[in-house]
């Protein structure tokens, strides 16, 4: 879909406006933490024309969020070095109303995909540090256990490290709840990869894929994530009085 055309920009604005109107009237309005106005816009690796259009759309999105008193969630658009690229724009925004969205795959979609655990963990730590230092909260809006090693012990460490580190800023959302195995993988990944996207398959104790960390509510979330052998360090402390 040519999202960057004027016609589709206008259609998107109509859809987003209607979404805000609907959300503000919804009975569960109070639990909404943020609104994504466009998911994973493809800027063609930072094409200047596309990024300019995207920035304008994000400025408009922020105005709508302010109007309806709902924070907006803005994806980086796959530009090179996204945290550096968007730092100036995000520095101008209200961090209580704008959330930066990243969909990290520190052991997948790389060239080449890393197979050394030290490299994989360091990739996660780098993401955590960038999120901690960013001018607005960063949500890891899509992540998974997918990796190129496919060993349960490494996958468990990989999951634990991501859960603990991605909470340093705006939190995270795992992708996704369940992936069904297909006998005809035309578009989807092979079974040994697809299962690492599947939370349901990684929750059972002793499963062969990797153990997803289970929070039982007996401690604070911070204490829980700090208990997961956090290879990147413990969650930072913030002074909320300033």
Where in the sequence are the language-model features?
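Substrate-binding cleft of secreted/luminal carbohydrate-active enzymes
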Residues: 131-223, 227-230
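Substrate-binding cleft of extracellular glycoside hydrolase catalytic domains
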Residues: 1-18
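Extracellular glycoside hydrolase catalytic/binding regions
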Residues: 14, 21-27, 34, 38-168
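Non-catalytic C-terminal accessory domains or segments of carbohydrate-active enzymes
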Residues: 225-242
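Alpha-helix initiation/capping motif
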Residues: 5, 115-116, 148, 222, ...
